[in-house]
Design a protein with these regions (language model features):
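Fe-S-dependent hydro-lyases/dehydratases of central metabolism
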Residues: 1-201
Length: 201
C-alpha cells in the first residue's frame, strides 16, 4: 500500500496458465456441474493455487454461458485465480450483441500445463464435502438422502431451474425429504416466476 501511495503504481504477478482442451460434447444426462467436478478431480492432483485456466477446443462450443460460469465458479474453490473461455457466438447471443469482441490468447502463448478432456467420457459426479472425495453417482445407489440443495452460485441459474421444473413436473418430494431451491440472483428468480418455473417447483 505504501508503494501505491508513493508511486501511484501497483505491481501484479501474472499467473502461469493451464490450457484445458475440451473434445466432443457431454452425454445426455450429464451436465456442467458434473464436468466442473470432473475437472476438480483432475486439478486436485496438481498444484493450481494462484494459476489461471484457459479452456480451448471444439467442446467449448457445446457449453452454454451458464455452463461456463458454473465451471469457472467451481475452479475458484481450488485456488485458481481466473478461468477464461474464448469469446464466441454463444457469448454474442448471450449479450444480444453480434459484434461482441474479447481478448484471447495468441498462437505463441506459453502454458505451464496442458490437459485434454474428452467430454464424452464424463459421467454424473457427487462431491463428498465432509471427506473431500469425488465419486460417481453410481457408487452411491441406495444411499438415503434427507436434504437437497439446488441453487446458489454454482447451480442456481435459469437453465438449472428450468431443468429442475422439468424433472419435478407431475411428481412429489418424498416424505421426510427437504429440497431447497435457491436462485442465484433476484433477476433469475423473477424470470423463473415469469416462466412459471417457481409454481412448478
Amino acid at each position: 500500500t505504501a508503494v501505491l501511495w508513493k508511486t501511484g503504481k501497483m505491481w501484479f504477478r501474472v499467473p502461469e496458465t493451464v490450457k484445458i482442451v475440451l473434445k466432443n460434447r457431454l452425454p445426455e444426462g450429464v451436465f456442467a456441474k458434473d464436468l466442473a467436478l470432473w475437472i476438480k478431480g483432475i486439478l486436485s492432483k496438481l498444484d493450481v493455487n494462484g494459476l489461471a485456466i484457459e479452456y480451448h477446443g471444439e467442446g467449448v462450443a457445446s457449453l452454454s454461458i451458464d455452463d461456463r460460469m458454473t465451471i469457472a465458479n467451481i475452479s475458484t474453490e481450488m485456488g485458481v485465480v481466473s478461468s477464461a473461455f474464448p469469446p464466441d457466438d454463444r457469448l454474442a447471443d448471450y449479450f444480444n450483441e453480434p459484434a461482441v469482441r474479447g481478448v484471447w490468447a495468441d498462437e505463441e502463448a506459453v502454458y505451464s500445463r496442458f490437459i485434454e478432456i474428452d467430454l464424452a467420457n464424463v459421467f454424473p459426479m457427487v462431491y463428498d464435502t465432509g471427506n473431500n472425495v469425488l465419486q460417481g453417482v453410481e457408487e452411491l445407489v441406495g444411499l438415503k438422502i434427507q436434504q437437497g440443495l439446488i441453487g446458489a452460485c454454482a447451480s442456481g441459474r435459469l437453465e438449472d431451474l428450468r431443468l429442475v421444473s422439468m424433472i419435478l413436473e407431475g411428481k412429489h418430494i418424498a416424505n421426510g425429504f427437504q429440497l431447497f431451491v435457491v436462485p442465484a440472483s433476484r433477476d433469475i428468480y423473477l424470470r423463473a416466476v415469469e416462466e412459471g418455473i417457481i409454481d412448478k417447483i
